[in-house]
Amino acid sequence: MEEVVTATCIAPINIAVIKYWGKRDDKLILPVNDSISGTLSTDQLCAKTTISASPTYTETKYWLNGIEGDYKSNIRMKNVIKAMKKLAKKKCPKNKALKYKLHICSINNFPTAAGLASSAAGYSCLVYTLAQLYGIDNEDLTPIARVGSGSACRSLNGGFVHWLKGVSPTGEDSVAVQLCDENYWPEMRVLIIVVNEGKKAVSSTSGMSLTTTTSELFNYRIMKCVPERVRLMKKAIAERNFKDFGELTMKDSNQFHAVCLDTYPPCVYMTDVSHRIAAIIHGYNKNAGETCVAYTFDAGPNVCVYLLEKEVRRFVTMLAAFFPCDAYDEGKFVRGIPIKYLSKISEEYMTNLGGSSYIERDRVKYIIHTKLGSGPKRLDDPDDSLLGADGLPKANPKVQSSIEQEVSVPPCEPHEVPPENVMYLGVPWGPQWAEQWLAQWGKPNGASWGGHGFPFGAPPGIAIKMDAALRSKVKIESTESSKSTSSNESDDATTSAARPDRQNAFQDLESKASTLNKLMDVDVEMSRVNQ
């Protein structure tokens, strides 16, 4: 029996800063304007594809995220495979895999069809894996990736990438070229703020088609605005000028969505939460006195944020304050590259950014923290294959660099050590200290010990919210359901009276909180917010 030929690869997503929207040729997927994007690291976000070719396969099949698709009706995938085989026959005519049917299995470790460039990662990974399978080296694959999904051509290069629209009717000059690699601007970071993991109502393909035929603003954008923005964006990247980079990114995102709204019927991708986050970012930049954070929205509600490394901790702490959620309480609010939250965000600062009227629980699901990365990579470990020896998807495939497996370090910035070792208000704080505290002092009235608190200056388990009228008062509130107590703890008042040492300890803690209150321009109530 002839040997089965297999290849497994991963490929990144890319987030455009100058948007691609609209085609001059739907079959060849030729864009009406140039676009520029940043390729994100596969350490956090990627598509993973395994392709096997075997003489025993009777037909070509594919599976996406564990579900078998209809290959016969997938015109774009068939066009990509046809183009890759044509190229392989020229470059590697003796490759035996060219004679066989294919089994293709692909998974994403991020939400699919939610406006996070899943098709870009998927088709770039398909093309690159086919190149590995057929032995194609040192070829520009971007024109073929483009036929699968336009933005996929940008994911074949790392760093910042420029996709040229080209002028040829056959598309040979519509290619993606690298402006700089991922190491050129090492301080650049990207946050993906996930507000909705569901599939968007209007696909990018449908939206583009409607826009090109109905929007009166569309031609003005592609003729007057985009060419100049591309020139300025290339200059900003070359100079590592974040102010210009950020402003151009946000302006182009705004105009892209304005064109979508000018489409008839309108294509509405952003939600009220999307707009709220955009407004908060403008407030953040105004408060900073310069553009230091930039949003951009693809065709979906989720927010992509470009910012420099030095801004990540403050921005994420601020965002967590505006959008508290279960993921934060469980230590999973930020996934990907770990961060340490800042210890406090002042009430005045929050007011400047919109105040308490902006605070809404569970409107942001989580944040993915990543950076710029390289293009696709081959994985040679057999355990990385998504297909079993029988050519069918594995029941429990190895997920590459899953963001679900990584959580951030809890808040501990002032101490620069893990929270297990910190001293807070003169008291050791952290998971292992909670048991010692309870053993020594008992459980205060109604108190319990939980996970992360609301991030107004809190270590794990405590939310800080100062009460201006009661600046010396400290209250520890319960956030857990009551648990059965032993007989010697049946009456908290009696126990408290019988144990003056515990009362003295809490009085000392209260005094220290009062002192801290005078040093910080926020109101504090030691209370884990119960919502």
Residue ranges and their predicted role:
Residues 260, 271, 473-499:
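Long, low-complexity, serine/threonine-rich intrinsically disordered regions
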Residues 16-19, 47-51, 152-155, 159-164, ...:
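Short beta-strand scaffold segments in enzyme catalytic cores
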Residues 411, 493, 526-531:
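A positional/structural detector of protein chain ends, strongest at the extreme C-terminus
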Residues 2-26, 30, 180-426:
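C-terminal nucleotide
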Residues 1, 91-189, 196:
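Gly/Ser-rich oxyanion-binding loop with an adjacent helix/lid
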Residues 1-114, 128-138, 366-382, 387-404, ...:
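ATP-binding N-lobe of GHMP and related small-molecule kinases
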Residues 422-470:
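Composition-driven detector of proline- and glycine-rich
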Residues 472-488, 505, 518-522, 527-529:
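Short linear regulatory motifs embedded in intrinsically disordered, acidic Ser/Thr-rich regions
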